[in-house]
Each structure stands twice: as structure tokens, then as C-alpha cells.
Swiss-Prot record:
HAMAP family: Ile_tRNA_synth_type1
Entry EC no(s): 6.1.1.5
Biological classification of the source: Bacteria, Bacillati, Cyanobacteriota, Cyanophyceae, Synechococcales
Top-level lineage group: Bacteria
Record organism: Prochlorococcus marinus (strain MIT 9515)
Subunit structure: Monomer.
GO biological process, one term: isoleucyl-tRNA aminoacylation
Location in the cell: Cytoplasm
Function: Catalyzes the attachment of isoleucine to tRNA(Ile). As IleRS can inadvertently accommodate and process structurally similar amino acids such as valine, to avoid such errors it has two additional distinct tRNA(Ile)-dependent editing activities. One activity is designated as 'pretransfer' editing and involves the hydrolysis of activated Val-AMP. The other activity is designated 'posttransfer' editing and involves deacylation of mischarged Val-tRNA(Ile).
Protein's name according to its UniProt entry: Isoleucine--tRNA ligase
């Protein structure tokens, strides 16, 4: 290997002023904190955002916004959701669709009501009536909406911010009454006594969508013995066959039914015990002579738990047990064994289920079947009432379980008490356990339109496809929807009850009248006006007969009516909407409530396509929480934290880039390391754009229209590659696969542009004569790249795209990048043959660059131009591609030495011995030599023939001619 060469003696004179150096006002730094708001102001002033999409002449595209709750600060979940929607809307706008995005807010419900109450002193709460609470809740919600709205706008989200939809607005509440009314008149809404999920902490009924199931819930479970007081005739015959009849009848005080329950507080409400007719049961005697009835398959488990040995006396089918009578465990009454259903299994317990019809849906159904009393033993606070007799006043979530268990123990009925871990429903707002409680509630009878809802699901496109299976199974299995709530902050159920009878007043006349009143005055009048003012004219004379109901509707009924209150009512929108896009939890929430109401009223789904995303997690895949200290605040991402070194201001575009980078169909991570990586990608894209802009500062496309056939091969390939990238990004946007856009963009800017085309172009741009064809053809291509790159990134990097557009140095027909429309590149640019040829040459270039980098690492050379490359081909495809380039390439641009940025490239039959480094791979042998000749002080190429320049400098002939001219 040759020793390190002495560096050329540097001249004091610099040819810098003779070079065509980069010139642009497009800053290398984004300065997002100040620049992004300026761009947003530009959009607003020039009516670029909302009005641009609304004025398009194409068909409507309606992405209907699922309303976030009007409470609390914006978080990363909001960012993921709203940015995804905005990317789609901006893309559709550029494609010419008529896009009018109406953002919305869900304004009613318990969290806001609780916030209002918590802000008041105790005497203020005491004096606050329902109307006063509603006015304070309205004020609170509007403040929250204003704060969230400003945050969304700062993220670059376009929408009808001056006219969003709010579920507290008059027209919305009126439309919701219309949906309720049509469902009632269609026979899908009824009032009935049923066990519902009841939240003692909120004092209201809850729907399934308002529940959550913590992982670490333990209940106090008990095994209880119920003393049999009478045996059925069928069992007596069976006993007689085994000669056991007299033994059991003479020892009834030792004959028991074994039950198991995880809700001991419901035992005072017991009205029966239920068995599965298909299960085999046994009467089994323990070592003390006590005889128990339980499922045969559970003998071993029960024996182990109770620490007793059992001897089976008789084995009977469950269907034979009906009619057996037992003494109630806490009351002076007798009950019977009844037949239950398949919910009774031998997976746990005893195979015999304690049945309290007022406190469980299965129990309720059994109670209805056998005409058992539907007794609710708990009040709205969770306190046991008079029906619980001696336990009245105990609270089911506090002391009731322990004291009832103690009573069972005292009466020798407690067999075992143990902690039992299982799924148990909690109120998602208060984070407290719920109970089943039978109350008079309003229900939507899903059974009445279930088949239509399932058909509607089939008609919708679900992304991902698993979403269809998920919502289908939920609708198949769901019971009737409890839509009434015992709270003040909501839309009232517009019903009047007879004061002295059981009749209700709810018909088309009252519904239409209330709907008109709410549209004019708002729902507050339900609490402000008396019955005479609320009733239609024909009922006013008998207004004293009626009293208005005070239940409000489930907030899921509120948001689930948005298709009627927004999409149907606003001319600029479409119903069904083209797209609903929310988190995957909305299969049981908004997607489902919207589907059920729309199908019940109009027999069709409210959406054509449903797209779901996962949740935002921290970098370690954990749920964000203040207690863990892992919350990522989108506001801090944009504006930076108190310590800007630790929490720099990245701007809205980096936040948006994060959304485009992730596979949002699953849960997605976010954190400081991820943000740093995204910031690097953002910077690379920005620097690429800056390089493009800076090198076309003296270019005007009007003067320089060039035919594709006149371009060098490298430029033709670059335009062909631009078409490929544009097509790939278009497909990614069309399929909502934004992570593919992110990957394509990154590869295009780094691999295709920075590392290849723009790297090669430096000599053409800086060194060539200013107006030479060699330079102008490159500028022509770069102008096409930068214009189309700006459009392609604009749905995601909207601020950067606009910044690029505003810094294009020549005049364009469009004042904004969003007025350009989506790229429709000339078909003449497409040349598949170039792709294959140049792909081969790029592979060779990569290998040669590795060899040159080896020289640089060993400090043998500084720049690649100090080298000469010999290549001995061993790959015919590469050899043919080099021959093709030499034959058809432009002699000023398509020299392979220029593509390598070396002083000379030779295809050889033999290698020289005098080399710096040699590399042998599947493409052939690559030899790196020290370049011969002298270095040109202007272009830094090494040439055999140089001339004297200024102040003893050396110039190659090319540079000498440029300087002279």
C-alpha cells in the first residue's frame, strides 16, 4: 500500500465567488414556535384551510368527527386521532373532493357535573337546583371547548372552528329528541323494571360502554348451606329405590343445598336457587353426617375447599330437583329450587346458583319465568333498604358483605369464605365498583332491530378487518340498551307520567312539540318550565294530570345521534358519512351507538367505512399516567418544556410526523427518544428541501421548458423515480397506510436524493457555467422535485410544505401549496428500463463508495475526488449497464466517474499493482488508486492537463473556460 500523500499546497486565492452557491430564505432551522403560527395565519387570511376544501368541485367527502369529551387538557390520544383525520382531509382536499370537516364535542354527562359540584362550597351545592347546575355545566363545557379548540388549531388541524357541533346546542338536542322519538314510535324504546348496571358512587344507571374492568379485583366469595325443608316427590322416589328415604326425612335438619356467591350482600334478596337440568347432581354425606346437594363434577373441588370427605348417597339429573324447598338463610320464609340455564356450569362454585331476581340479569330472567318477586334490596346510594330487613342501612360496597357473612356464620350456614379474583365492572368515571340493581328504566330494545344492525355491519368496510368481527360479536351478544340516567346534566327523556296512575304520555304529538321547543329554546326549559308550558296545546287543559320525567339520556345516545344532528342537517356533509375514525374502544362506544340509532331509525348504517387506531403508550409500552410520571404532553412537544435542553420545542409538524410514522392499527409508543429520531428525519427532509430551493434561486421554468428526451439519463431517471415515489405515496394515502408514506419519504429524501442524485448534482450546480445546459437541466429537474415534494408531504408536514412553497424563488400560479392539487405527472416521464439499468449502476456505486470510505477511514485520502477507480467486472448485467451508459449517456452529465464523484473511472481487463485498496465482491473487483495529475483549485478534480489560474492556482480546462467566459 502506498504511503500517505502530501496534501497539495493551498493557494491563498479562492474561486468561491465564481461558483453558483446555494441561496434561499428557507431556513435550515424550522423555528416552528414562531413560523408555524405565521403559516396558519397565512392560511386563515387567504381562506386556504376550510374554504379551500369546501369550494372544491368534486364529490363530497365526509369524515364525521367523533366528539371528544369537553373536559380536561388535550393528550396524545387526541393528537393521534385528530392528526390522522386531518391528514386524510388534507389529502382529499388536494385530490379535489369537497371536504368540510365539522369538529364536535360531547358536552353532557357525569364528569362535567362532578367538576361543577367539586368547584362549589358545601352550602353552594346544597342551594344548587338542577337548572343552576345545568347553567354552570354549560359554562364549564364551553371553557373546556375553547381551550381544546385552540390546541387543535395549533396542531394545524383544519375544520369549521367557527361552527363546530356541540351536543349542548339547541339544534343538536332537538335532533336527538327526534331520534329518540322515531325509535319510540318504531317500537324500539320501552320502560321497564330490569336489573341494570348501577353506580352507587354516581347514583345512576350505566350502559355497558360506561364500564371498565380492572385487572386486580377481588370479591368476598362464600359457600353457604341452605337447610332443605321439603323434598320433591321425584327425589323421594329416587331415595326409596336406594332405601334412603327414611334416613333423609328423619334428618331434614342435616340436609342442605350448597351454594356459592361472590355477592354476599344479595343473599337477603334470595328468592330461589337455580340448577342446570343437564348437569348431574349428588346428595353426598360428610363425616359429620351432614348431607349436601351439589354438582357431581365438583365433589373433589368442594371436598378440598371445605376440608371434608364426602360419600355419595344418590346421583340425580338436575331436572329432577325442581320443587325441593329450603329455608331462606336470613328471612322467615321458604323458597324452591328452580331450573336455570346454561349460565350454570361446573367451572366453579357448586353448580347451584343463588338467585336474587332484582340483582342480576340471569336471575331476573329466571324470576320472570317462575313469577318470583323482582325485589330490589338496595337504594340509589348502595344502602340496603327495608326489603333486606335486619340488614337495612348497610352499604353494599362497605359493611354489608362482612356483616351478612358474620350473620351466616352465627347461624352455622357459612361453609367457607375466601377472596376471589375475577372480572368485575367499575364505573369508568368514578373508578368505583358497580352493582346490578333492578329499577324502572328506559331501554332500547336491540332485539327488535338486531338482524338489521348485523346486516348493516356487513355493508360497512372495516379497517382493520378485525373490527368487523369485533363489533359483530358485540351486537350479536348485547342485551337491551339502558338509555336512562338519573342525572341533571343531559338531554331529558321527553316523557310525562300520570300523577295518580301508571299511564305515560309520550306520542308523536308530544315528541314533535318538545323537539320544536328545544330547537328554539334549548333543553334547559325542561327544568325551567312547568308541564302546562311544555305540553302541546291539546293537552294543556289537563296538564295537572301529568308530571314530567327527570331522567336524562345516556351520553352514548347523545353522541350516537350525531349522524342525525350533524350529517343529516348540514348541507355540506353527507349521510351516511364516508368515514368514521376513532380508537378501537369505540366498537363498544360511539361506533355501536351510532350504528344502533341509525339502523333503528333509517335501517342503514351511518357510515360507509370505519377506521380504528390504537392507544398512545410510553416508550416502554406502558399506559400513560401521572402516577408513573410517563405522560407525554403534546403541548410540550410543540412548544417545549421549562428546560428546553431536555424538552426542546419540536413544533406541530414533528408531532404530525410521529402520527404518520406509526402503525396506528395497534397501540403506539411515544417518548423523548422517539421524538429525537423523528426530529432527525424531519431535519433531513427539511435540509433536502432547502438544498433544492437554494439551487434554483436563479431559475425560471417559463424560460426553461425542456423536453424529457433532451435530458441526460440521470435526469430522466430522476423524473421517472419521482413518478414512482408519487404513485407509491398516493397509494399509501388512499389506503390510509401513512407509515408507508413515512418510509417512502425517508428513503426518497435520503437514499434517492441526498445520497445519490443531489450528491452527484453538486458539480453540475456549483461548478458549471451559470446558464449552461448542464446546470439548467439539473435545475429543471430540481424544480419539479421540490414542487411535487411539497405537495406530497403537505397532508402530513403541512407547515413545512407551505414554507417550501412560499420560498419557491419563481412565481407559481398557486399562492399556497394546497391550491396546487395532487400531482399528476406526465406519462412521458415513466421509463421502466431506466429503473433496472440504474438500479444496477447504483449497486456498483454503493460497493465502490464502501471501498473509498475504507481509504478515508485509514486517512489515505480526504475527498473521493483524490481517487481513480478501476473496475474489473465479474457480473455481465453490471458490465452491460456500464456499456449502455457510456453509449447513450450525456457526455457532460452521465460519465460514471461523475456519478461516483471520483476523478476517473475505468473498466479494465487487468488490475494495476499500484493501488490504495482493493475490494473483491460478487459484482467484480474494485481497485482504488490515487488520482493522477494535478488538482483543479476550482472544481477539485484531478486532471493530467491543467493551466495556470489566478495567483499561481491551477485550473482544469473546463474551469478555465468558464472563468474566461
Amino acid at each position: 500500500m502506498k504511503p500517505k500523500n502530501n496534501k497539495d499546497k493551498k493557494s491563498k486565492f479562492s474561486y468561491k465567488e465564481t461558483l453558483n452557491l446555494l441561496k434561499t430564505d428557507f431556513s435550515m432551522r424550522a423555528n416552528s414556535v414562531s413560523r408555524e403560527p405565521q403559516i396558519q395565519e397565512f392560511w386563515l387570511k387567504n381562506k386556504i384551510d376550510l374554504e379551500l376544501g369546501s369550494s372544491n368541485l368534486g364529490e363530497k367527502f365526509t369524515l364525521h368527527d367523533g366528539p371528544p369529551y369537553a373536559n380536561g387538557s388535550l393528550h396524545m390520544g387526541h393528537a393521534l386521532n385528530k392528526v390522522l383525520k386531518d391528514i386524510i382531509n388534507k389529502y382529499k382536499t388536494l385530490k379535489g373532493f369537497k371536504v368540510h370537516f365539522v369538529p364536535g364535542w360531547d358536552c353532557h354527562g357525569l364528569p362535567i357535573e362532578l367538576k361543577v359540584l367539586q368547584s362549589l362550597k358545601s352550602h353552594e351545592r346544597k342551594d344548587l337546583d338542577s337548572l343552576g347546575l345545568r347553567k354552570k355545566a354549560t359554562d364549564y363545557a364551553k371553557i373546556q371547548i375553547k381551550n381544546q379548540l385552540e390546541g387543535f388549531k395549533r396542531w394545524g388541524i383544519w375544520g369549521d372552528w367557527d361552527n363546530p357541533y356541540l351536543t349542548l346546542k339547541n339544534n343538536y338536542e332537538s335532533a336527538q329528541i327526534g331520534v329518540f322519538g322515531k325509535m319510540f314510535l318504531n317500537g324500539y324504546i320501552y320502560r321497564g323494571l330490569k336489573p341494570v348496571h348501577w353506580s352507587p358512587s354516581s347514583r345512576t344507571a350505566l350502559a355497558e360502554a360506561e364500564l371498565e374492568y380492572p385487572e386486580e379485583h377481588y370479591s368476598s366469595s362464600v359457600y353457604v348451606s341452605l337447610n332443605i325443608s321439603n323434598l320433591s316427590d321425584e327425589i323421594l322416589l329416587k331415595l326409596e329405590e336406594k332405601d334412603l328415604k327414611n334416613k333423609l326425612l328423619s334428618n331434614l335438619n342435616k340436609l342442605f343445598i350448597a351454594i356459592w356467591t361472590t355477592t354476599p350482600w344479595t343473599i337477603p334478596g334470595n328468592e330461589a336457587v337455580a340448577i342446570n337440568p343437564r348437569i348431574n347432581y349428588v346428595f353426598a354425606e360428610d363425616q359429620n353426617g351432614d348431607i349436601f346437594l351439589f354438582a357431581k363434577d365438583l365433589i373433589s373441588e368442594i371436598s378440598e375447599k371445605l376440608e371434608r370427605e364426602f360419600n355419595t348417597l344418590i346421583d340425580v339429573k338436575g331436572s329432577m330437583l325442581t320443587g325441593i324447598e329450603y329455608k331462606h338463610p336470613t328471612k322467615n320464609k321458604f323458597c324452591n329450587i328452580v331450573i336455570g340455564g346454561d349460565y350454570i356450569t361446573t367451572e366453579s362454585g357448586t353448580g347451584i346458583v343463588h338467585t336474587a331476581p332484582g340483582h342480576g340479569m340471569d336471575d331476573f330472567n329466571v324470576g320472570k319465568k317462575y313469577h318470583l318477586p323482582i325485589t330490589c334490596i338496595v337504594d340509589e346510594k348502595g344502602n340496603l333498604n327495608n326489603h333486606a330487613e335486619k340488614f337495612c342501612g348497610l352499604n353494599v360496597l362497605k359493611d354489608a358483605n362482612d356483616l351478612i357473612i358474620e350473620d351466616l356464620k352465627k347461624n352455622n350456614l357459612l361453609l367457607l369464605k375466601e377472596k376471589y379474583k375475577h372480572r368485575y365492572p367499575y364505573d369508568w368515571r368514578t373508578k368505583k365498583p358497580t352493582i346490578f340493581r333492578a329499577t324502572e328504566q328506559w331501554f332500547a330494545s336491540v332485539e327488535g332491530f338486531r338482524s338489521s344492525a348485523l346486516k348493516a355491519i356487513e355493508d360497512v368496510e372495516w379497517m382493520p378487518k378485525t373490527g368487523k368481527k369485533r363489533i359483530y360479536s358485540m351486537v350479536v351478544g348485547r342485551g337491551d340498551w339502558c338509555i336512562s340516567r338519573q342525572r341533571s346534566w343531559g338531554v331529558p327523556i321527553p316523557v310525562f307520567y300520570e300523577k295518580k296512575g301508571k299511564e305515560i304520555l309520550l306520542n308523536s304529538e308530544t315528541i314533535n312539540h318538545i323537539q320544536k321547543l328545544f330547537n328554539e329554546h334549548g333543553a334547559d326549559i325542561w327544568w325551567d318550565w312547568d308541564e302546562k308550558d311544555l305540553l302541546p296545546k291539546q293537552y294543556k287543559e289537563e296538564s295537572d294530570r301529568w308530571i314530567k320525567g327527570l331522567d336524562t339520556m345516556d351520553v352514548w345516545f347523545d353522541s350516537g345521534s350525531s349522524w342525525a344532528a350533524v350529517c343529516e342537517q348540514r348541507e355540506e356533509l353527507a349521510y351516511p358519512a364516508d368515514l368514521y375514525l376513532e380508537g378501537s374502544d369505540q366498537h363498544r362506544g360511539w361506533f355501536q351507538s351510532s350504528l344502533l340509532t341509525s339502523v333503528a331509525v333509517n335501517n342503514k348504517p351511518p357510515y360507509k367505512k370505519v377506521l380504528t387506531h390504537g392507544f398512545a403508550l410510553d416508550e416502554n409500552g406502558r399506559k400513560m399516567s401521572k402516577s408513573l410520571g410517563n405522560v407525554v404532553d403534546p403541548n410540550i412537544i410543540i412548544n417545549g418544556g421549562s428546560n428546553q435542553k431536555i424538552q426542546p420545542a419540536y413544533g406541530a409538524d414533528v408531532l404530525r410526523l410521529w402520527v404518520s410514522s406509526v402503525d396506528y392499527s395497534v397501540d403506539v409508543p411515544i417518548g423523548s427518544n422517539i421524538l429525537k429520531q423523528l426530529s432527525d428525519v424531519y431535519r433531513k427532509v427539511r435540509n433536502t428541501a432547502r438544498y433544492l430551493l437554494g439551487n434554483i434561486h436563479d431559475y425560471d421554468p417559463i424560460d426553461e421548458e425542456i423536453d424529457i428526451d433532451q435530458l441526460p439519463i440521470l435526469d430522466q431517471w430522476m423524473l421517472n423515480r419521482l413518478v414512482d415515489v408519487s404513485d407509491q405515496i398516493t397509494i399509501a394515502y388512499e389506503n390510509y397506510e401513512f407509515s408507508k408514506f413515512f418510509q417512502i419519504l425517508q428513503s426518497f429524501c435520503v437514499v434517492d436524493l441526498s445520497n445519490f442524485y443531489l450528491d452527484i448534482a453538486k458539480d453540475r450546480l456549483y461548478v458549471s457555467a451559470k446558464s449552461s445546459i448542464r446546470r439548467r437541466t439539473c435545475q429543471f429537474v430540481m424544480s419539479k422535485i421540490v414542487e411535487n415534494l411539497a405537495v406530497l408531504i403537505s397532508p402530513v408536514l403541512c407547515h413545512m410544505a407551505e414554507d417550501i412553497w412560499q420560498n419557491i424563488p419563481y412565481s407559481t400560479n398557486e399562492k399556497s401549496v394546497f391550491e396546487r392539487g395532487w400531482p399528476n405527472l406526465p406519462k412521458s416521464w415513466i421509463n421502466p428500463e431506466l429503473n433496472e439499468r440504474i438500479s444496477n449502476l447504483r449497486k456498483l456505486r454503493v460497493e465502490i463508495n464502501k471501498a473509498i470510505e475504507g481509504c478515508r477511514t485509514q486517512q489515505i485520502i480526504g475527498a473521493a475526488l483524490e481517487t481513480e477507480v478501476n473496475y474489473l467486472p465479474e457480473n455481465e448485467i453490471i458490465k452491460n449497464s456500464l456499456s449502455w451508459l457510456e453509449k447513450f449517456g450525456n457526455k457532460e452529465v452521465d460519465l460514471y466517474s461523475d456519478w461516483l464523484i471520483v476523478s476517473k473511472f475505468n473498466v479494465v481487463n487487468n488490475l494495476f499493482e499500484d493501488y490504495l485498496i482493493i475490494d473483491d465482491n460478487e459484482l467484480g473487483k474494485i481497485q482504488i488508486l490515487k488520482a493522477k495529475g494535478q488538482k483543479c483549485d476550482r472544481c477539485w478534480h484531478y486532471q493530467s492537463n491543467t493551466v495556470m489560474g489566478i495567483e499561481d492556482t491551477k485550473l482544469c480546462k473546463r474551469c478555465a473556460n468558464i472563468i474566461t467566459s
